[in-house]
Amino acid sequence: MNIPTIFWVVPAASVVALAFAWGFYRLMKREDEGTDRMREIAAHVRKGAMAYLRQQYKVVSIIFVVLALFFAYLAYGAGVQNEWVPFAFLTGGFFSGLAGYFGMKTATYASARTANAARQSLDRGLKVAFRSGAVMGLVVVGLGLLDISFWYLILNAFVDVTGPQKLVIITTTMLTFGMGASTQALFARVGGGIYTKAADVGADLVGKVEAGIPEDDPRNPATIADNVGDNVGDVAGMGADLYESYCGSILATAALGAAAFAAAGNEALQLKAVLAPMLIAAVGIVLSILGIYLVRTKEGATMRELLRSLGVGVNFSSALIAVAAFGILYLLGIQNWVGLSFSVITGLVAGIVIGQATEYYTSHSYKPTRKIAESSQTGPATVIISGVGSGMISTAIPVVTIGVAIILAYLCAIGFDVKNMLAPQNLSLGLYGIGIASVGMLSTLGITLATDAYGPIADNAGGNAEMSGLGPEVRKRTDALDALGNTTAATGKGFAIGSAALTALALLASYIEEIRIGLLHNGVTMLDLPSGATRFVQDASILDFMDYYHISLMNPTVLIGLFIGAMMSFLFCGLTMNAVGRAAESMVQEVRRQFREIKGILTGEGTPDYARCVAISTRGAQREMLLPSLLAIIVPVAVGLIFGVAGVMGLLVGGLSSGFVLAVFMANAGGAWDNAKKMIEEGHFGGKGSDCHKATVVGDTVGDPFKDTSGPSLNILIKLMSMVSIVMAGLTVAWHIF
């Protein structure tokens, strides 16, 4: 199949993204790192972060080799899988890990430079931190599109099939590299989350509550580990998470597009449907770069003004991609291009609404978080109760928003043909519309991820300023940047969860297409439906497959899968919460030991052993991340082998529905507890050191693993289970008990 000229826009956009990422990195490196003390602290954090990442990549590499060998056996030995899968799996993991490495390397160099820039002005500090965060955003989208372009070119050259089926095979094969990205992302998120929260909880409980010293105080032995953790969890982890969503949404939509137009036999239209999500993402990169340059602020800006500064860039990029979608789909000549353009807009609007809802429930500018701070007057128990209640209530808007986005994207794609919305052609086109909505939501990831990666950079800059003893004016500026970072981080988590839900739904639909390929690969060409009718596998609709495998709520295997999927979210959260608890216990004991045995720490005369705390967090994270992460891979395989395709569909639906709601609850409750504590630290209800402050520190400590370990990891869990099911579809079709 000839490569159309317009395709080359996709790799070109990825190169542009990487070039600008390199440019922003070089600009950041030219900034002065400040005093000798600031350089020393930054070096400690950088050394700890890189040591952790090296150790994590060693462990993950072993797991990747084992899985790649297993996939190679399935492909070349058992013959139940596409021969390209082992290689696609490895490249997905490699590029995901590479994105995390570059993002974290940039963040560890940027923190001291941001603190030093804040000595000049608030605007200067904001620009250094935000453009350093933009390196992460642009590296993720650049490497993502580069990987997609690479595999499209390779498979187009080597897949020896003609006709519409060629694009179906290419897109479903490309989808499997998402499992590599998902696996890498889960280890990065879970391991990073355990690391950062073990350090954070240890630093807070012993430092703030017991010793009564401020946050980021150099006398606290866990403070360097805490700062390392911000980079490990919130930069490398978040980057890998959104890399996976970004690639997954594009690839799932391309696979749905290939399937939607395969039956019609129109290869030209089929190719356009495959290229559309890639081109929307490519144009989104350029518009994200333009938006990055619009972010600036004035001295003495309030929180609302700082949020508006970031909002200008994000909203500019989002508005332009909404307009650009019409142009892209019109030029491609896609069927119902107007409706599909509105599907893109649906995804964009859903992302914005979820972000705003998250801000409302987590920022202390609004009533829910202020009520949590107010409840601290009666102790930590009421702080916990009000935070849990607020987090549960906060699930309503995101869930309704995603529901509305799904039905609108579907109806827009089929031209609001409500009477025939489940007709085979409309079903395929409607699911493609949902996929294109997820691409729309993530199309401006270059700038939305920049606002998210900005958070830990600003947080580390504040820590550097505190530990370096910079003046109150500088600390005031870094506090303002840090407070903004807390809000953008919470908003970013909401965005990541929403995008994960839409991406997982697109992957769920793609699973059926992978079943089709699995049947053909196993030599099955005809389906004998329960009604007595027969269908060629190649021409069967999604509804035919649902009928063939008895995918109905009356089928006990579907119900069993549904319950296991719902249980997986809670089991996974329980394991990760306990992992943080165990790792934090070790950290608390170590900090207490140092306060007790190293003379002069609390008076500032002795030097804490920072390296030992870093080592404890690293060991704890590596040990504790294995069980929950491997469970996410093993359970979908086991369900497929026992309960077959119907059981897997139940598993994915149960995991998506419970995981999405639970992730929103945990992220928002944790964010609200954090900002309630920040509100009191600003002087409300007695300020720092008061009983109210201690009560909110307890709430924040409980919320830490909620918002930074378990909650964000659920995004990846629901996508990884889908990806594993897709990769194992051939195995499930060939061997299952029920």
Provide a role label for each language-model segment.
Residues 1-738:
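Hydrophobic packing and interface segments
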